[in-house]
C-alpha cells in the first residue's frame, strides 16, 4: 500500500496558506488544513476531492496545537511537512499602536511557529525525517513604517527559524525561513487599520496589488513549497525581498533612513487606536481599479 505523506498547514484556510496547501496537494500530500475558523476551513477543503482534512486550531494555544498534531498523527500518519503561515497584519503609525497590538502579533507570528515546530519535532526527530517551514516576510528583514507590530513579530520568526535550521543540520529534519515580499493574495481586506484607517487601507492595498512590486501568489507558493521540500534554510520570494536582504546587510543605516523618508509620505497619527478591518472600509472607484488583481485573488483564495 502506498503511504501518502502528510502536510500540516497552519493558517491553511485562506490566502497564502490556501495557496501553499494547493501546491502541497499537487505534490501528492494529504493536506491537513489548520485554522481557527471552521466555516473557512470547510470552504477551503471543498475544492479538494481527496487527501484533505480540516482541524480547528489556534496557533497561540500550545496545548491545542499539540492536541491537533496528535490527532493528525493518529488519524493520517507521520507528518512529513509542517508549514506555519498564520498571521495578522495591523497597519498604522506607531503613535496609534497600543501594546496589545504587539501582543497579538507576537502570539500568532512569533510564538505560533514555536508552538507548531515543538509539537511536530519529536516525531520528526524520531523518524529522522521531516520539513518545517515558517513564512516570515521582507518585513522581518527591513522594518517598514506603519507595520511595527507585524515587523517585530516577523523579525522574531526569522530569528527562530534561522537558529532552528542550524541546530537541526545533520538530523534529517530541516527548517526553512520563507521571506516573501508583497504578494497578491487578497489579504489586504483581512488586515486591520488604525489611525486614519481609510487612508492607511488605500496605500497598503494599492501597494499589495501593484504588479511591478507584488508577486503572483500561486507562483510564489510553488517556490515556497519547492524550497521547503528541498530542505533549503532560506527561500526569498520576489526581487524586493532579495534586494532588502542585501541592502539591509550592506547599508543598515541608509536603509533605516530610507524608511524614515518614506514615512513622511504616509498618513499622520490621529489618536484612533481601534482597529478597523479592511473589508469594512469603503474605497474610492480609483482604488478599486488599482486593486483589481488583489480582489480577484481574494475571491480565489477564500478571503471573504
Question: How should each PLM-predicted stretch be described?
Answer:
Residues 27-43:
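Conserved glycine-rich Rossmann-like NAD(P)H-binding loop of the short-chain dehydrogenase/reductase
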Residues 170-241, 256-257:
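SDR active-site lid
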Residues 117, 153:
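Active-site helix of classical SDR
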Residues 93-94, 101-106:
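Substrate-binding pocket helix/loop in short-chain dehydrogenase/reductase
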Residues 56-67, 99:
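The beta1-alpha1 cofactor-binding region of Rossmann-like NAD(H)/NADP(H)-dependent oxidoreductases
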Residues 13-14:
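Conserved glycine-rich cofactor-binding loop
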Residues 137:
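Residue(s) in the substrate-gating loop at a strand-loop-helix junction
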Amino acid at each position: 500500500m502506498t503511504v501518502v505523506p502528510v502536510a500540516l498547514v497552519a493558517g491553511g484556510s485562506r490566502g497564502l496558506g490556501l495557496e501553499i496547501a494547493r501546491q502541497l496537494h499537487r505534490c501528492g500530500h494529504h493536506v491537513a488544513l489548520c485554522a481557527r475558523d471552521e466555516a473557512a476551513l470547510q470552504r477551503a477543503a471543498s475544492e479538494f476531492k481527496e487527501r484533505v482534512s480540516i482541524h480547528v486550531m489556534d496557533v497561540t494555544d500550545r496545548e491545542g496545537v499539540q492536541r491537533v498534531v496528535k490527532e493528525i498523527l493518529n488519524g493520517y500518519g507521520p507528518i512529513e511537512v509542517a508549514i506555519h503561515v498564520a498571521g495578522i497584519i495591523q497597519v498604522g503609525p506607531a503613535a496609534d499602536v497600543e501594546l496589545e497590538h504587539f501582543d497579538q502579533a507576537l502570539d500568532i507570528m512569533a510564538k505560533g511557529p514555536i508552538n507548531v515546530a515543538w509539537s511536530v519535532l519529536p516525531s520528526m526527530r524520531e523518524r529522522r525525517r521531516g520539513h518545517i517551514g515558517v513564512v516570515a516576510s521582507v518585513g522581518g528583514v527591513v522594518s517598514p513604517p506603519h507595520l511595527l507590530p507585524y515587523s517585530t513579530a516577523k523579525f522574531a520568526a526569522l530569528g527562530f527559524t534561522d537558529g532552528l535550521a542550524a541546530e537541526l543540520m545533520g538530523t534529517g529534519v530541516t527548517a526553512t525561513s520563507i521571506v516573501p515580499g508583497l504578494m497578491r493574495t487578497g489579504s489586504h481586506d483581512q488586515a486591520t487599520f488604525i489611525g486614519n484607517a481609510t487612508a492607511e487601507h488605500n496605500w497598503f492595498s494599492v501597494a499589495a496589488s501593484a504588479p511591478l512590486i507584488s508577486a503572483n501568489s500561486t507562483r510564489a507558493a510553488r517556490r515556497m513549497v519547492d524550497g521547503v521540500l528541498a530542505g533549503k534554510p532560506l527561500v526569498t520570494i520576489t526581487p524586493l525581498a532579495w534586494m532588502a536582504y542585501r541592502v539591509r546587510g550592506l547599508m543598515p543605516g541608509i536603509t533605516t533612513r530610507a524608511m524614515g523618508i518614506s514615512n513622511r509620505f504616509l498618513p499622520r497619527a490621529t489618536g484612533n487606536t481601534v482597529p478597523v478591518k479592511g473589508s469594512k472600509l469603503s474605497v474610492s472607484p480609483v482604488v478599486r481599479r488599482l486593486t483589481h488583481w488583489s480582489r480577484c485573488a481574494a475571491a480565489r483564495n477564500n478571503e471573504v
